[in-house]
């Protein structure tokens, strides 16, 4: 079974490249740690290659829909909210991590999204 992690980033926030990289990094760590605790088998299989894909959505509404779809399919997710020290307001949701989880399950949610 192929296991991957997908990070979905909002593009409406006009974050700089460095800011996006930092937020994606936060999402990767949060998602991996969540799955390490909740599903060690998936985590162990994912850990070998650590497949990650970064996708984009246009706004918070689309991001919330991806999150809701993950909840409905019982796929682990983690949300990143910014501290507000630099480019965006405190508490702004910037991205989410879906998985690490089985690729086929994640693709049901994110298969139509575009690469960042």
Where are these predicted regions, by residue range?
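Acidic-glycine-rich active-site phosphate/pyrophosphate-binding loop
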Residues: 1-5, 68-72
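Glycine- and Gly-Pro-enriched alpha-helical subdomains that act as flexible
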Residues: 2-38
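Short basic, glycine-rich beta-strand/loop surfaces that mediate nucleic-acid
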Residues: 7-8, 48-58, 72-116
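Short, well-ordered secondary-structure micro-motifs
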Residues: 18-20, 66, 90
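Compact, glycine-rich, soluble single-domain proteins
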Residues: 25, 33-61
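Short amphipathic alpha-helices within nucleic acid-binding modules
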Residues: 61-67
């Amino acid at each position: 079974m192929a296991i991957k992690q997908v990070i979905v980033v909002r593009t409406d926030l006009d974050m700089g490249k460095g800011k996006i990289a930092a937020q994606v990094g936060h999402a990767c760590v949060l998602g991996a740690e969540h799955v390490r605790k909740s599903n060690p088998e998936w985590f162990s299989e994912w850990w070998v290659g650590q497949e990650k894909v970064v996708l984009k959505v246009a706004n918070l509404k689309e991001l919330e829909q991806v999150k809701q779809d993950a909840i409905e399919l019982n796929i682990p997710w983690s949300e990143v909210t910014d501290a507000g020290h630099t480019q965006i307001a405190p508490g702004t949701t910037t991205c989410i991590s879906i998985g690490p989880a089985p690729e086929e399950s994640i693709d049901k949610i994110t298969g139509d999204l575009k690469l960042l």
